[in-house]
Amino acid sequence: MNDSQYHQLIDDLLINLEEMLDDVEADIDYESASSILTLIFVNGSKIIINKQPPLHQLWVATKFNGHHFNYQDGLWIDERTGVEFWQFMNDAASKQAEVPVSFPRPTE
């Protein structure tokens, strides 16, 4: 993947996630600036999602841990746990929102 493809993939992912946030039942606020998306939960906790261009990775920081995702076979996969990004976000957001949260993986 070249730099242009990488940036387009991340930009699309962030836009998809922003659009989904408007439809979730949990009260999750968000801020978006300079390719950083911050999800803000009622309890004050945050999930921060950002690009890591030199490594072509997507980084996610939760109140529990940091995660680095690599693009493999059309999916963003956590390099440590092997979990796919959207499944990870469902689990992480549900924990931090303290209610079930579901982000369906977008279709291409």
From Swiss-Prot:
Q: Does the keyword Iron apply?
A: yes
- Segments crossing the lipid bilayer: none
GO: which molecular function terms?
A: ferric iron binding; ferrous iron binding
Alphabetized, the UniProt keywords read: Iron, Metal-binding
Q: Please name every pair of cysteines joined by a disulfide bond in this record.
A: none
- Pfam families for the chain: Frataxin_Cyay
**Gene Ontology BP terms:** iron-sulfur cluster assembly
For this chain, the family text in UniProt reads: Belongs to the frataxin family.
Query: Which PANTHER family would you find in this protein's record?
Result: FRATAXIN (PTHR16821), FRATAXIN, MITOCHONDRIAL (PTHR16821:SF2)
Recorded protein name is Iron-sulfur cluster assembly protein CyaY
Q: Which organism is it from?
A: Pseudoalteromonas atlantica (strain T6c / ATCC BAA-1087)
Annotated gene = cyaY
